[in-house]
């Protein structure tokens, strides 16, 4: 099917052909022939928070978010926080969003998410080399525990005691090629371009969707109505996953852990103006940001952002969003 696209490009250019495939990355890595230069790629991701708000029928609120009219946004903060709780639980997988928009039924949403996770397990067994299927499965199941650590750097020993990188590198690559995980590298130094300083041995792993992470972790729907506890579950794992999910739509995020120090910046971005922008993620309204302030001081950062439940505020060295 993939090779037929070359025919359409060369012999039937008047037709616009769209082809979809969930495991295309794996096929290409396995040496399948591909019509180079004949195909444009478009990566699809789970629905963003703004798209979720629109799917809930709140188009005016979605437009308000896009407008960045912060004074108005602050007035509707309780409503946005309610929708954000819903998004943490439902996530952005289209079928889960559709069912929730129609029924507001938490159990039906979870049933769909569990079905998606089961289909991923079947894909692992069907499409991955048989000798690495157990390692792929073990690695995949370890991700909630990886993200619930205080330090979210990926540790092979969390998969099983004594596990080593060489045993799981291929399994990790398979999950990445399948589009089931995002890999966020540490940078050895916060310098431009960030890609030149990435540390290939130090990274965080996130799953593709915050709702699926909740399903993998058996998060109960009761956390939705229990104050703001959903924002702090698993040491803020859902919050960091949520932020990553929005960033990945536009940027290639990194993070920075200063050597021989406790200083860590949750995400580093290289923006359109070639500025290095540090982001710190806070799951609550407690926004003490010692690491972020130190980073801004050391690197003379022009921009810095802190993501929290607090209202928008622009200070002299940081913007709270």
Question: Where on the chain are the PLM-derived regions?
Answer:
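Catalytic cores of nucleic-acid endonucleases
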Residues: 283-320
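Accessory nucleic acid-recognition modules appended to NTPase machines
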Residues: 93, 98-271
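Structural motif
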Residues: 275-277, 303
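Terminal-proximal interaction/regulatory segments of ATP-powered molecular machines
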Residues: 277-283
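Conserved nucleotide-binding/hydrolysis micro-motifs of P-loop NTPases
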Residues: 22-27, 46-50, 188, 212-213, ...
């Amino acid at each position: 099917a993939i090779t037929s696209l070359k025919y359409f490009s060369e012999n039937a250019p008047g037709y616009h052909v769209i082809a979809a495939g969930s495991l295309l990355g794996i096929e290409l890595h396995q040496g399948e022939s591909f019509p180079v230069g004949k195909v444009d790629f478009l990566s699809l991701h789970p629905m963003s928070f703004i798209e979720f708000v629109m799917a809930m029928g709140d188009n005016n609120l979605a437009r308000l978010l896009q407008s960045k009219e912060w004074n108005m946004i602050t007035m509707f903060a309780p409503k946005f926080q309610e929708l954000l709780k819903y998004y943490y639980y439902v996530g952005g997988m289209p079928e889960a969003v559709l069912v929730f928009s129609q029924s507001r039924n938490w159990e039906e949403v979870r049933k769909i998410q569990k079905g998606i996770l089961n289909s991923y397990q079947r894909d692992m067994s069907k499409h991955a080399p048989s000798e690495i299927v157990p390692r792929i499965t073990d690695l995949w199941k370890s991700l909630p525990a990886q993200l619930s650590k205080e330090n979210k750097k990926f540790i092979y020993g969390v998969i099983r005691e004594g596990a080593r990188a060489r045993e799981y590198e291929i399994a990790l690559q398979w999950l990445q090629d399948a589009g089931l995980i995002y890999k966020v590298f540490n940078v050895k130094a916060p310098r431009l371009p960030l890609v030149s300083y990435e540390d290939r041995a130090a990274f965080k792993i996130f799953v593709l969707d915050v709702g699926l992470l909740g399903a993998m972790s058996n998060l109960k729907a009761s956390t939705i109505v229990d104050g703001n506890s959903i924002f702090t579950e698993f040491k803020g794992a859902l919050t960091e996953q949520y932020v990553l999910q929005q960033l990945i739509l536009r940027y290639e995020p990194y993070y920075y852990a200063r050597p021989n120090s406790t200083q860590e910046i949750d995400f580093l971005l290289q923006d359109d103006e070639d500025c290095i922008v540090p982001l710190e993620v806070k799951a609550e309204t407690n926004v003490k940001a010692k690491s972020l302030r130190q980073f801004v001081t050391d690197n003379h950062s022009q921009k810095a952002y802190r993501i929290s439940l607090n209202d928008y505020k622009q200070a002299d060295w940081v913007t709270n969003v």
